[in-house]
């Protein structure tokens, strides 16, 4: 199907390639079964990161980590609900951990 939009408005960057750690999968299952966390909101943040269209909106408080987690990034899904991910130069995004501060840093 063709579009009447100018070519510039039809261009987009490719979505990022995605991977996840085994621990991330375990975190997802644990949090999903607990019923305390909005997993749909987590999926929304993940899709924004994968889409690669723009930085996450400010409400996610996306930032680089330091110390043992240097090289990783963290965003706040809501309250004390976090997503840790690794954004590599190759364009690969690896979802590494998710949970509360206590789950991830203590």
Predicted regions and their residues:
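Basic, Lys/Arg-enriched alpha-helical interface segments
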Residues: 1-79, 88-93, 102-106
């Amino acid at each position: 199907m063709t579009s009447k939009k100018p070519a510039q408005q039809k261009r987009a960057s490719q979505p990022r390639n995605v991977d996840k750690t085994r621990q991330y999968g375990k975190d997802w299952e644990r949090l999903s079964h607990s019923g305390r966390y909005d997993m749909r909101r987590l999926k929304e943040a993940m899709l924004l990161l994968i889409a690669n269209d723009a930085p996450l909106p400010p409400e996610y408080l996306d930032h680089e980590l330091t110390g043992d987690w240097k090289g990783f990034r963290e965003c706040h899904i809501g309250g004390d609900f976090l997503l840790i991910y690794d954004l590599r130069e190759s364009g690969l995004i690896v979802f590494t951990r998710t949970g509360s501060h206590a789950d991830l840093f203590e």
